[in-house]
């Protein structure tokens, strides 16, 4: 919180400070009160906060098999889920930019299988072209301010900050179709490490990209599971015969996919 207050008192020497919080699943549990209040208060215009949570599904180094998506959703905090070592770097940069733009903290879920891996990465700081979308913010903005009224914080978060995060994700193609077909029949929706596992499973079944396209298999990889982009899912689902949702631990994406598609004409 202090980093985001640095420019509020007229004596700062920098335009803003961006910050990172890190904890494993149990650490997130213990920090909920502070994070909920800080997400409601918001970030500074030139700051931003990235909340990195390590989910250890196999409990190799923690005492609970955490799955933090539901916690981020309850906090109403935008969350990104990188699928590779390269994406940990990329999504961190996107996450800070999203936090700065939307006025909300941004969560980053990482799992042991990814963060314990070794891989070559492109470290060029100018490789990413972050797009700042057009968005109709309220006249008084969405960032942290002194004397903020508590009763206004939740409406500001729900009506502006989360939609702004969604607009940012769309502008930067964080939810993208990674497998395409000229005649799509079967759609797979996944996120993070599970999306990598799906691709690996298909390869082990002898189904490469060309064969998947020929069989009508397409895949939507949700880089931002929350806030959930229902429009992206509806566009992806158009014309499909069947949709398979692959995710870890909880029915987080599945229930939202069902709600987005239920009772469509």
Regions found by a protein language model. Give the residues of each.
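Thiamine diphosphate
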Residues: 1-100, 111
């Amino acid at each position: 919180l202090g980093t985001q207050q640095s420019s509020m008192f007229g004596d700062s020497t920098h335009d803003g400070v961006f910050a990172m919080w890190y904890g494993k699943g149990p650490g997130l549990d213990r920090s909920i009160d502070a994070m909920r209040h800080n997400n409601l208060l918001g970030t500074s215009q030139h700051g931003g906060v990235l909340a990195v949570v390590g989910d250890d599904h196999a409990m190799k180094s923690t005492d609970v098999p955490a799955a933090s998506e539901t916690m981020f959703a309850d906090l109403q905090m935008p969350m990104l889920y990188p699928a590779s070592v390269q994406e940990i770097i990329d999504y961190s940069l996107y996450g800070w930019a999203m936090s700065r733009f939307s006025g909300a903290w941004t969560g980053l879920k990482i799992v042991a299988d990814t963060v314990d891996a070794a891989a070559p990465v492109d470290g060029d700081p100018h490789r990413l072209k972050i797009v700042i979308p057009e968005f109709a913010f309220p006249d008084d903005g969405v960032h942290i301010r002194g004397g903020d009224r508590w009763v206004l914080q939740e409406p500001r978060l729900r009506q502006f900050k989360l939609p702004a995060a969604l607009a940012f994700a769309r502008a930067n193609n964080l939810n993208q179709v990674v497998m395409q077909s000229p005649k799509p029949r079967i759609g797979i929706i996944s996120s993070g490490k599970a999306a990598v596992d799906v691709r690996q499973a298909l390869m082990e079944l002898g189904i490469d990209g060309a064969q998947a396209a020929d069989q009508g298999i397409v895949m939507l990889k949700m880089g931002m599971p929350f806030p959930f982009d229902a429009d992206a899912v509806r566009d992806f689902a158009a014309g499909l015969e069947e949709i398979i949702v692959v995710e870890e631990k909880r029915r987080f994406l599945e229930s939202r996919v069902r709600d987005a598609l239920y009772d469509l004409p």
